[in-house]
Curated annotation (Swiss-Prot):
Cofactor: Mg(2+)
Recorded catalytic activity of this chain's protein: apo-[ACP] + CoA = holo-[ACP] + adenosine 3',5'-bisphosphate + H(+)
EC code(s) of this entry: 2.7.8.7
Gene: acpS
Protein's UniProt keywords contain Glycoprotein: no
GO CC, one annotated term: cytoplasm
Family assignment from sequence similarity: Belongs to the P-Pant transferase superfamily. AcpS family.
Primary residence: cytoplasm
Stated name of the protein: Holo-[acyl-carrier-protein] synthase
InterPro entries (UniProt xref): 4-PPantetheinyl_Trfase_dom (IPR008278), 4-PPantetheinyl_Trfase_dom_sf (IPR037143), ACPS (IPR002582), Ppantetheine-prot_Trfase_dom (IPR004568)
Known function: Transfers the 4'-phosphopantetheine moiety from coenzyme A to a Ser of acyl-carrier-protein.
Enzyme class: transferase
Amino acid sequence: MIIGIGSDLIDIRRIENSLQRFGERFVNRCFTDIEIAKSEGRKNRAASYAKRFAAKEACSKALGTGLAQGVFWKDMGVVNLPGGKPTMQLTGGAAARLQEMLPVGHRAAIHLTITDDFPLAQAFVIIEALPVAPAEGTV
């Protein structure tokens, strides 16, 4: 069952301005080490950071908190599954909020799609609660 949906649309030029104005301070405040390594290795790093920024905003909306109630920028990070599909890795307050949302006997699956077409970057997050299969031999 779907327990959270969030979306965000951002102007890439806004991120370009933040990168120029605040540099590492902005990057280190908002992004995880994995996101920084991925974005710094890209030809268009502003678009890469913008997609990840939009993903964090969308995820915070799917959590139902926004960037409040103990959920911080670096608690949410875009990571890629082995096949390359992006998803969100949650820690700290974001992970705690996700656990609060989950019904008993369920685990979370976070679905993420990110895209950009200058000057815009967009992200959608769906949080799904999936039933945990009972262990063998239990009733």
